[in-house]
């Protein structure tokens, strides 16, 4: 499935995607993703965040965003990833996350971070498989919609170090080529 930039024409499909997510999944998304004005502002590019979708026909199957942090952390980007439940486990999340990593490298970011609820084993495996490692465990850091406190893990990828290592062995140019 192609990965495309989020544009205004995708707003309705993206809203349907977020509305179809189980309530438990939406608990761990920072933004109010079912608010049409939020999604429209994203598509208009008003906040400077880069966002991409994986589309199957007119339906969104996955979403990834790359937020450049402000101020003294402007060398750091935060990745936020959501994949439709029916599309999980097939490599789509990895493809989207990898796309964000490559775009982060291309925009000059030196470090990427992702926040993952500690119980989300598949997400932890996905990001560690892409070179991320644990930097922090924040105990009882988030509260789900039922009021239960959950641990949050912060994973980081020092992309500059990784990129220079890949360039040394000649595989950097293969990073964004489709596998097959």
For each feature predicted by the language model, list its residue ranges.
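Conserved GNAT acetyl-CoA-binding A-motif
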Residues: 104-116
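Conserved acetyl-CoA-binding loop-helix of GNAT-fold acetyltransferases
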Residues: 89-106, 125-129
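C-terminal "cap" of GNAT-fold acetyltransferases
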Residues: 140-180
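A short beta-loop-alpha structural element at the N-terminal edge
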Residues: 1-16
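Conserved catalytic-core motifs of GNAT/GCN5-like acyltransferases
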Residues: 113-116, 128-150
């Amino acid at each position: 499935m192609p990965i495309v930039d989020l544009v205004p024409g995708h707003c309705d499909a993206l809203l349907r995607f977020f509305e179809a997510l189980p309530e438990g999944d939406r608990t761990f998304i920072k933004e109010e993703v079912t608010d049409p004005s939020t999604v429209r502002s994203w598509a208009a590019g008003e906040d400077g965040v880069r966002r991409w979708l994986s589309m199957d026909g007119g339906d969104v199957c996955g979403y990834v965003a790359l937020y450049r942090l402000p101020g003294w952390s402007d060398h750091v980007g935060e990745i936020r990833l959501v994949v439709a439940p029916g599309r999980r486990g097939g490599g789509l999340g990895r493809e989207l996350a990898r796309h964000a990593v490559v775009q982060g490298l291309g925009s000059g970011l030196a470090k990427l971070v992702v926040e993952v609820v500690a119980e989300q084993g598949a997400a932890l495996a996905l990001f560690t498989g892409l070179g991320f490692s644990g930097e922090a465990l924040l105990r009882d850091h988030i509260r789900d919609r039922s009021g239960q406190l959950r641990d949050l893990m912060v994973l980081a990828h020092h992309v500059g170090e990784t990129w220079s290592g890949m360039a040394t062995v000649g595989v950097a140019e293969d990073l964004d080529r489709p596998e097959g």
